[in-house]
């Protein structure tokens, strides 16, 4: 039994590693500090057109942490974009690197996309709630929902986002046109 479990684990790690190696040489990310919200915008040079809005993927940025991957929710998929709150460890180091050289380009591996997105088109009213950096998921859903509406649509969308400071909301408001053009 232990041999089967070990084999499955080794296979999983091998597949993930091969995906990272495949995407790493051809992919760069631009790091942009979002000082008002203490976050980093990470924009990849390659798209993931097959990813659903609100999906998550594992990022590998060897110049920040050589042997670690971390899961983050995509804000958009063409190009792939993440907004990552600076907390501790990797995210703090990522924010520091972005602040030291805004617009810095780094080699980046990406593995994913993962996640199941709820279907919202069959309802008269859609209400999306988010708190803090959890907005990356609901923002991507809202932009995708808006793009799928036609002129005669009777559906409505309520978007509720709780933030600690007004600065946090500027992360998306000031970049709304860019993100909404790229989110679907």
Over which residues does each language-model region extend?
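C-terminal, well-structured subdomains that either form a transmembrane helix-short loop-helix hairpin
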Residues: 115-146, 156-164, 168-171
């Amino acid at each position: 039994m232990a041999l089967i479990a070990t084999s499955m684990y080794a296979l999983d790690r091998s597949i993930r590693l091969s995906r990272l190696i495949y995407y790493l040489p051809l992919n760069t990310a631009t790091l942009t500090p979002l000082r008002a919200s203490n976050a980093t915008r990470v924009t990849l040079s390659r798209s993931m057109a097959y990813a659903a809005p609100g999906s998550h993927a594992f990022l590998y940025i060897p110049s920040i942490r050589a042997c670690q991957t971390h899961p983050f929710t995509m804000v958009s998929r063409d190009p792939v974009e993440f907004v990552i709150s600076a907390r501790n460890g990797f995210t703090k180091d990522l924010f520091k690197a972005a602040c030291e050289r805004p617009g810095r380009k780094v080699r980046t591996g990406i593995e994913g996309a993962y996640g199941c997105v709820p279907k919202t088109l069959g309802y008269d009213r859609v209400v999306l709630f988010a708190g803090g950096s959890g907005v990356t998921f609901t923002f991507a859903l809202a932009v995708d929902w808006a793009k799928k509406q036609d002129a005669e649509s009777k559906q409505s969308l309520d978007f509720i986002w709780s933030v600690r400071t007004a600065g946090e909301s500027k992360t998306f408001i000031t970049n709304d046109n860019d993100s909404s053009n790229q989110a679907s």
